A protein has these predicted regions:
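Redox- and metal-dependent alpha/beta enzyme cores, enriched for Fe-S-associated oxidoreductases
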Residues: 235-268, 272, 278-284
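Peripheral docking tails and interdomain loops at the edges
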Residues: 299-357
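Conformationally flexible catalytic loops at phosphate/diphosphate-handling active centers
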Residues: 27, 156-235
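Conserved thiamine diphosphate
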Residues: 110-160, 164, 352, 356-357
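Active-site nucleophile and cofactor-binding loops and adjacent substrate-binding regions
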Residues: 22-24, 44-56, 70-76, 98-101, ...
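N-terminal alpha/beta PP-like core and its mobile active-site loop of ThDP/TPP-dependent enzymes
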Residues: 60-69, 75-135, 184
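Glycine-/acidic-rich phosphate or pyrophosphate-binding loops and their flanking alpha/beta elements
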Residues: 2-6, 220-243, 256, 260
Length: 357
């Protein structure tokens, strides 16, 4: 199935029974799958009148204790930013899938990774964070969407799946090996209308002096706990590497092939693939920076994650960047030729020509 279909089905398997969305390419397969499957499992599917309406519908169902999801791409995610801030400010769990497309503006429907800043730094107002998960295969889309609902409930926080058009549209085998969740424990904080307990209040408005600062301090404490316990990454062939590629999503798939090809021409290349973009694997990068000669960050953007890599390694070694913008996807040859420009060939002549592999 496609990556988009895998995201939708994994959400259903994870117990999501409320989906609200609005059509936009390249994520429409998510909406189509939800429209078909939600009635079959007794869930609710609504194609909202707008992206803004969809994110606020999410707010209501999440407050009632349901597992909820929306999805969009590029301009649609931008429209949701105020609502995402409200969800974070109300500490409401939800899952948001962003199938990135080229920008800025209307852009195009090609794959991109230019929404990184918006996702990991917080595109809406206020000091809030989302957990951001970055799959690099259709199977991993399914796995991470399933996990995203557990993380959202665990921390009462929005979780974003940051994909791209290529991952969303590609087809690969998928196994839903985790048990479908047919029962979810009640959420003590939810607005259920139950009698016999203190009333629950869900809000993000704190007009009394000092209340908002106290709330923000509690949020930051929660975020620190997430940073301490939820970092995920994959590290490949870094033990003896002279250069380590850092890439996520589609670019990580390409970088893995670059690593394999480069080894055949005498280069010791490793790969660090962040799976959580927030919290970012800064400690892993910091450790690597003590023993590798240089890093190269590969992105489908003008360079966004590269800033977090530089902040992580504290100037211990050079950080190079290669990126394609506006829907461009880096090729293995392009990346290898950039490696040849920045790193002398191992066990061979220092001067090498550009090559085609």
């Amino acid at each position: 199935m496609t990556g988009n279909e895998a995201a939708a089905e994994a959400a259903i398997q994870a117990g999501c029974r409320f989906y609200y969305g609005y059509p936009i390419t390249p994520q429409n397969e998510i909406i189509n799958h939800m429209a078909m499957r939600m009635p079959q499992v007794g869930g609710t599917f609504i194609q909202a009148e707008s992206e803004i309406a969809a994110i606020n519908m999410l707010h209501g169902s999440a407050a009632a204790g349901a597992r909820v999801m929306t999805s969009s791409s590029g301009p649609g995610i931008s429209l949701k930013q105020e609502g995402i801030s409200y969800l974070a400010g109300s500490e409401l769990p939800c899952v948001i899938v962003n199938v990135q497309r080229g920008g800025p503006g209307l852009g195009d429907i090609s794959p991109s990774q230019a929404d990184y800043f918006q996702a990991v730094k917080g595109g809406g107002h206020g000091d809030y964070r989302m957990i951001v998960l970055a799959p690099s295969s259709v199977q991993e889309i399914a796995d991470l969407v399933y996990d995203a609902f557990d993380l959202a409930d665990k921390y009462r926080n929005p979780v974003m799946i940051l994909g791209d058009a290529q991952l969303g549209q590609m087809m690969e085998p998928v196994e839903f090996y985790k048990p479908a969740k047919t029962y979810l424990p009640p959420k003590k904080w939810a607005l259920t209308g139950a009698d016999g307990r203190p009333k629950n209040v869900i809000k993000s408005f704190y007009p009394v002096k000092g209340e908002l600062e106290k709330f923000n301090r509690r949020l930051q404490k929660k975020y620190r706990k997430i940073e301490e316990t939820e970092v995920r990454y994959e590290e490949i062939n870094t033990k003896d590497a002279d250069l380590v590629l850092v890439a996520y999503g589609t670019c990580a798939r390409i970088s893995r092939e670059v690593m394999n090809k480069a080894s055949k021409i005498g280069y010791r290349i490793g790969l660090l693939r962040p799976i959580t973009l927030w919290p970012f694997p800064k400690d892993a990068l910091r450790r690597l920076s003590q023993r590798v000669r240089t890093f190269m960050v590969v992105e489908m953007s003008a360079g966004q994650m590269v800033e977090d890599v530089k902040l992580s390694i504290l100037g211990r070694c050079p950080v190079h960047f290669y990126g394609r913008m506006g829907g461009g996807v880096p090729s293995t040859n392009e990346i290898i030729n950039n490696i040849l420009e920045v790193l002398p060939k191992i066990n061979a002549a220092d001067s090498v020509e550009m090559i085609e592999i």
